[in-house]
Amino acid sequence: MRVLVLGSGVIGTTSAYYLARAGFQVTVVDRQPAAAMETSFANAGQVSPGYASPWAAPGVPLKAIKWLLQRHAPLAIKATADIDQYLWMAQMLRNCTASRYTVNKERMVRLSEYSRDCLDELRLETGIAYEGRSLGTTQLFRTQAQLDNAAKDIAVLEQSGVPYELLDRDGIARVEPALAGVTGILSGALRLPNDQTGDCQLFTTRLAEMAVELGVEFRYGQNIERLDHAGDRINGVWIDGKLETADRYVLALGSYSPQLLKPLGIKAPVYPLKGYSLTVPITNPAMAPTSTILDETYKVAITRFDNRIRVGGMAEIAGFDLSLNPRRRETLEMIVGDLYPQGGDLTQASFWTGLRPTTPDGTPIVGATPFRNLFLNTGHGTLGWTMACGSGRLLADLIARKTPRISAEGLDISRYGNTQENAQHVNPAPAHQ
């Protein structure tokens, strides 16, 4: 059975790999010249199942108002003429309740924990190397209020059976010795010892090579224009003016997925949240992070690779704008300079931005659609690297009609209710150009 996977980021590539392992004949198509050239290229580098949390949380609407007035805020909103931006924001606000937060976080942690286990198995089976570390993640709280507010997250961790440790200042210095000199600005920390780190782009590139060995064909530099459909089936995909056919189709185009789905009458609430990262060469390994640090105040992750520090975070609701905002670089430099002033050379840092495909409830969209042979794997937000292996394995099981190892409840697009309009009344338009 032939499967056409659209997108070669970490989500598309893991989908292709697990589909090939399940015996499918797989082709991957992407407009870029290689795998992991967009959102997967320079993300924060953390595999953090326990910190899988939706942006839509109680208290966020009030915090957002304050953030808009701050210079170094974790969230910024740039008004556009795109009506989808405002519809998405309205949906997100509806998810900022305690009850919705609990449901959404459970779904995210469920998939993330499974994904971490799949990554462990993959590494054991293949020996894939990607500058990975298995030394946990430490979330830093600069205020007592932040530490107190962690109670709701800890409750979900306990419900999901995720190990954790609350740290005082001495505990922080024990797990991250380079922070010993700055613990005075911290109130405490939450550590998840089972979390991991690694270079997502390096992982994706090497997994693509392994997928090729399994028979997967990667076709780069090709423009995906639109899906051709009739009734409840996809007939093919228009690629560079030619109709390409398969038995099953997987849409893993991140923030661009809705553009291909809209002509089918499918409303997928996936919108880009623009993020930024700095990659800093390490000059003093003893003064650099041991693993991953999360700064709760600024919503920024600081991750240790072999000889580099990756500082990633921020969220701009700004449509598909990929311009580099110097103020965001200033913020990232300020944070890493605050915590690890002697760890790396900021003058040699590389600055990057990417679009995180985010759903209003934080949970990705993985699974079937109203079209019998079309499947989605998109909307992972800031957790594409964390959720990639589990999402790819889950999707392959669903397409193969095998019982997945975890519950897929609440993960497919049906959770949004009536997502399909009458497709025949929607004019097809080229996408992903």
Curated annotation (Swiss-Prot):
Its EC number is 1.4.99.-. GO terms for molecular function: D-amino-acid dehydrogenase activity. Pathway: Amino-acid degradation; D-alanine degradation; NH(3) and pyruvate from D-alanine: step 1/1. Transmembrane segments: none annotated. GO terms for biological process: D-alanine catabolic process. SUPFAM superfamilies: FAD-linked reductases, C-terminal domain, FAD/NAD(P)-binding domain. It catalyses: a D-alpha-amino acid + A + H2O = a 2-oxocarboxylate + AH2 + NH4(+). InterPro entries: DadA (IPR023080), FAD-dep_OxRdtase (IPR006076), FAD/NAD-bd_sf (IPR036188). It holds the Pfam family DAO. Keywords: FAD, Flavoprotein, Oxidoreductase. The keyword Transmembrane helix does not apply. The keyword DNA damage does not apply. One of its GO terms (cellular component) is cytoplasm. FAD binds at residues 3-17. It comes from the Bacteria. Its cofactor is FAD. Oxidative deamination of D-amino acids. HAMAP family: DadA. Belongs to the DadA oxidoreductase family. NCBIfam families: PRK00711.1. This is D-amino acid dehydrogenase. The gene is dadA.
